[in-house]
Amino acid sequence: LRGEVDASLLSRANALGWQGKTPVSVIVGNRPEDDISRATEAMRRYAKHAQLDVMAGVVGQRLVAIVGGTHDPMGAARHFANVYAPGPVIAGHIVDSLDQCHFSAQAALSGFDSANAWPGAPRPVSSNDLLPERALGGDDAARELLISKIFKPLVETGGELIETIDALVTYGGIEPASRALFVHANTVRYRMRKITELSDYSPMEPRELFVLNIALSIGRLGERH
């Protein structure tokens, strides 16, 4: 989980039944209060049924599972969710192999630490869906993703899309935003579609508008002189 992977560590993983299936992701949640071995055995049973690799263990008060062989970490997390104690369950993004799993682990652990900032978050939730909360909590990787995936593509188109997001956040709807921008409401709708095409986030959805707003704020902070 710290990125300290060498041949001996991979050998020990193999001894625990890790077969080297890829891609790999990490799932994090609260450890159950009862027998941990019962929880990890339940994970192993599901993994065997689904033809996945899994290694699980306790880190502090968290139960961390490394899952190999799935392109759908959220699907695996949904199957594992009942094993965890109440609280957030975070599925990290997929990586190519076990020696890169620390990237997924860092994202999942960061998401776990910041999930309380989104009271309505689903359970489980992807670490990528917690980018704003992770960024606000000081996660540099999340900040960089918001800048590279949202802020920069929008800035590169000029100022119209940025000012449209600002107006939607400030005035709370298409009609009031169009009046503030002195444009027709259909122009705002067209810009909203362009925003979605460029960023994969729709300003029509309140949660996604929040993500866009945080991305703009973080990007602007990075441009301070």
What are these regions (language model features)?
Residues L1-H225:
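Cytosolic nucleotide-utilizing catalytic cores of signal-transduction proteins
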